[in-house]
Amino acid sequence: MIPLPVAAANSNSNSNSNSNDEESPNLSTVIKPPLKKTKTLLPPPSSSSSNRPLHLRVSIDNNNNNNAPPPPADFSDHQWNYPSFLGTTTRKRRPSSVKPPSTSNLRFDTIPKTKTKTKTNTNTNTNTNTNTNTNTDLPPPPVPSSSPVARPQHHNHRSPPIFYLLIITCIIFVPYSSYLQYKLAKLEDHKLHLCRQSQIHFSSGHGNGKISIPIHDASFSYILSRKAALYIVLFTLILPFLLYKYLDYLPQIINFLRRTHNNKEDVPLKKRIAYMLDVFFSIYPYAKLLALLFATLFLIGFGGLALYAVTGGSLAEALWHSWTYVADSGNHAETQGTGQRVVSVSISSGGMLIFAMMLGLVSDAISEKVDSLRKGKCEVIERNHILILGWSDKLGSLLKQLAIANKSVGGGVIVVLAEKEKEEMEMDITKLEFDFMGTSVICRSGSPLILADLKKVSVSKARAIIVLASDENADQSDARALRVVLSLTGVKEGLRGHVVVEMSDLDNEPLVKLVGGELIETVVAHDVIGRLMIQCALQPGLAQIWEDILGFENAEFYIKRWPELDGLSFKDILISFPDAIPCGVKVAADGGKIVINPDDSYVMRDGDEVLVIAEDDDTYSPGSLPEVLKGFFPRIPDAPKYPEKILFCGWRRDIDDMIMVLEAFLAPGSELWMFNEVPEKEREKKLAAGGLDVFGLENIKLVHREGNAVIRRHLESLPLETFDSILILADESVEDSVAHSDSRSLATLLLIRDIQSRRLPYKDTKSTSLRLSGFSHNSWIREMQQASDKSIIISEILDSRTRNLVSVSRISDYVLSNELVSMALAMVAEDKQINRVLEELFAEQGNEMCIKPAEFYLFDQEELCFYDIMIRGRARQEIIIGYRLANQERAIINPSEKLVARKWSLGDVFVVIASGD
């Protein structure tokens, strides 16, 4: 009988009696003893041995020796949860370092327990202590394994259904293939047996010779090779699925074989392989083609091996049949046998898949190439072309002028690089509905700030580069132009042509020239238009003349060297060109300085070039000197300037520069009325920020009025009938698009005209200081005054399509700002030297283009040729370049028949280049 363990918790006599009572009951009557799970805490290291709890011991030899040594204190308390006859506990055991028990004694030690509280309450808790001692847990049987390592947790990984399907397929087909191999071996044995029975006997000279065909060894080796092929095919079929499922365990297996421990967290092998494939297909352009080639070769080899395993032919024959099945899926129709048909159908299916992949690759390659061409990503291989960087509203008129300039050479090539889609750019150019006359326009999508995109359009081989201003504000646009110039200077191959940069602010021009050097030519668009509007306000009709000179449709400026003119004075050179009009000289001795309207005594030297106005660069040449008649002509001095009253409707960014130009042109006592929606205090701040000293103006007086120019009530508050000139500016403070700006200007123009016509009875109150300086008989001024009730109205028009509305109504002289700027850019792109000519003619100092009446040069109905009038103009230090008859609408610049005499009237006017000093 095995005694139950007794816990000696106390040293009193009750513990002994309880211990004796526990040994008396019969074990057969005990079904399930009361159990009590106890938890014991490890004593602190500093506790003495006297405070340690007593430990229980079970002796196998039924020896109740109370003097036995105490068991070790490292036994787990969970082993006392159940008696030994109830089986082991289901609770997870803690790792233990206890050695296996010996055959003599078996000891179960618990973790040292803390003292119970029954020691302090002996009298009151006697029953509690008794029950506690009686219901002490029984130890379980010893643990079979003494390993301290915890049992690994098994994770239930569910395999994919296709893996089980593959296993079932292999289980079915492997016995079947073995059966076929067995049957084939029997047939081979039967065949060998028949061959041995039909041995061939040959008779020779000394006896009978018997030669048998050694078929057995060959048949055996043939069967083995087919078996090996079959096993290779089956293994190859199973291998991808095995790799897919267990590929991530491969590094662990390798580490185990190498006896190394890699505790670092690493990316799974499947993800790493997928990443490498992704990188391979992304970096190398021919990766897809190589993958398709590898798949084709693998299918041919694998299919040939499978055919060799199920057919009786050779391996070479099987590979050839495999290729035919891949190339043509219909070749397997004549196959015989189940195995051969299954393999041939599989190979044909793979061939169809490879063919579909090949079609996809070819289609993708063609689509990618077409998209590249459509999106403008391919390189432009051109020479001597004009490159335009950027996109703006001026591009249409710029392309038109460049196409007209290239007409004489049979056309050219213009390349546009902008940050827009190629299809969108081509669509916008198509909407221009303009005949480019043999000039090709190539659009490319890209950024002018990127060197790769600049090289894509052959920037180093272009004969001229035009940088357009963006639609942003002035500072941002000029900053972007500066970055583009820096990108152009960074081209390693260098630039062959010059760079024309459209600037928005005159203050930023020196910085761009400093960065670009001698290759940079700047055109300050806003400044040019502002000065031109001032000149047109003072001299109506001048806008049409500038439009004819700047455009390539009529006469324009050219500079050329003529050695046969060396030694001649400028007075003789002036009448030496039948088809051109000399305007100046490029002095070689002065560093190539261009002198406009030089003295008559200037003599041409070696290296000097002549500046002329001609139809084209190849339509003029010097001829013999004609005989001209200077004669007697009236010497009328220029009339003194009178004070004028001018109205500005709208606000421009460079309005401070326009005021300074008016200060230089107008007589003292003039008034400038400014009518716009900008508050008066803000106007003063903007004018001061632009460098204008309002209190330092001597000739003009500023009058501020605030209002909306398209509201009739606001316009009626102005004395519109008293102004000499009215300038309608493209109001940048209100509108930001070309169409809206022109609509606003046109509405303001119509309202002013209607208000002036209603105030017609009060027109006598108008100032009598109408411009009389040489224009008392000017038909243009008279027509403009009659059309707009004695006020000259100048409208700034951005869109050329709006010009027709203004010109047909004959209510205003217009200024095409965008088109004139485009003409200037095109002219400077063709010849950068012309930029210095335009800068001087647009400036308030130096020579200028103006309109003079005929009474300065001739008498009424006097018959003279154009050369005679040119000689008379030299007496006033002027160069006459054209005229407008009284009965005509447009002026004629550089007339063709200069020696033909005709009668002139005092209603005619002449276009001259004169000094403004």
UniProtKB/Swiss-Prot annotation:
User: RCK N-terminal domain location, by residue?
Assistant: 383-524, 643-792
Q: How does it sit in the membrane?
A: Multi-pass membrane protein
Q: What SUPFAM superfamilies does UniProt report for this protein, alphabetically?
A: NAD(P)-binding Rossmann-fold domains, Voltage-gated potassium channels
Q: In which tissues is it expressed?
A: Mainly expressed in nodules. Also detected in infected and uninfected roots, leaves, seed pods, and flower buds.
**Low complexity composition bias: residue spans:** 7-19, 119-136
Residue ranges that the Swiss-Prot or TrEMBL entry lists as coiled coil: 413-435
Polar residues bias locations: 78-89
Induction record: Slightly repressed during the first 2 days after bacterial or Nod factor treatment.
A Pfam family this chain is assigned to:
Slo-like_RCK
One CC-aspect GO term: nuclear membrane
User: Where is this gene product found?
Assistant: Nucleus membrane
Arranged from A to Z, the UniProt key words for this protein are: Coiled coil, Ion channel, Ion transport, Membrane, Nucleus, Transmembrane, Transmembrane helix, Transport
DNA repair as UniProt keyword:
no
Transmembrane region(s): 160-180, 230-250, 290-310, 342-362
Gene3D superfamilies registered for this protein in UniProt: NAD(P)-binding Rossmann-like Domain
- Provide the effect of E830K: In pollux-9; no nodules formation or arbuscular mycorrhizal symbiosis
Instruction: Give me the ranges of the annotated region Disordered.
Output: 1-154
Provide one Gene Ontology biological process annotation: monoatomic ion transmembrane transport
Family membership noted in the UniProt record:
Belongs to the castor/pollux (TC 1.A.1.23) family.
> Partners and quaternary state?
Homooligomer.
The record's PANTHER family line, in alphabetical order, gives:
ION CHANNEL POLLUX-RELATED
What is the purpose of this protein?
Answer: Ion channel with permeability for potassium. Involved in perinuclear calcium spiking but not in cytosolic calcium influx. Required for early signal transduction events leading to endosymbiosis. Acts early in a signal transduction chain leading from the perception of Nod factor to the activation of calcium spiking. Also involved in fungal entry into root epidermal cells during the establishment of the arbuscular mycorrhizal symbiosis.
What is the protein name stated in its UniProt record? Answer: Ion channel POLLUX
| Species name | Lotus japonicus
- The record's gene field reads POLLUX
